[in-house]
Amino acid sequence: MTYIENIFLCMVSPLLVAALCMGRRHLRFFLFCIVGMGVCLLSAYINTFLASVCQADALAATAEIAPVVEEMMKLLPLVFYLLVFEPEGDKIKATAITVALAFATFENVCYLIQNGADRFSFIFFRGFGTGAMHVLCGLIVGGGLAYAWQRTWLKIAGTWGLLGAAITLHAVYNLLIAYGGAAQYVAYALPVLLVAAGRLSTFRLSRMK
């Protein structure tokens, strides 16, 4: 049995100390790192509860429950941040990526502790794949919210649309992982390639301007 709340406390403790030492300028980054890990912890409990209530098998829990719960949980702190602080577009995107990155980091650490770290090649691909998938979902939601929340008429519909896109991407990734075999490695490579392609296209557009 993995006591993920103990892992959470161990990982959050140095972040809290660093947040106190770095000052207000970097406080937002550390706070949203802690928030990202916190929503990952809560997502694990909610996933387990819903899978038990719905009597879902492993595939249904992985492909149907987990993507919805996890993407909604990652969205909630962003919506709170938008409603309370009304940040600029760049800060919205950076915050979404920070939450997603912390979420993926905590998830990977829990996976390593539960399943062991003896298979380097598998852990290497999984670390990059899962991290890139969560960051890609963060890019989609964060970049989209930065645009949608500048337009009052688009706030609600845009937020739900972005959430749906992130859930779909997450569900496809989880389905490929659950299928196993070559599809599993396709799933690990796909988000990395999409992030790389997005960065390359952004670089080319900036050079054209």
Tell what function each PLM region has.
Residues 1-209:
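Hydrophobic alpha-helical segments at protein termini of multi-pass membrane proteins
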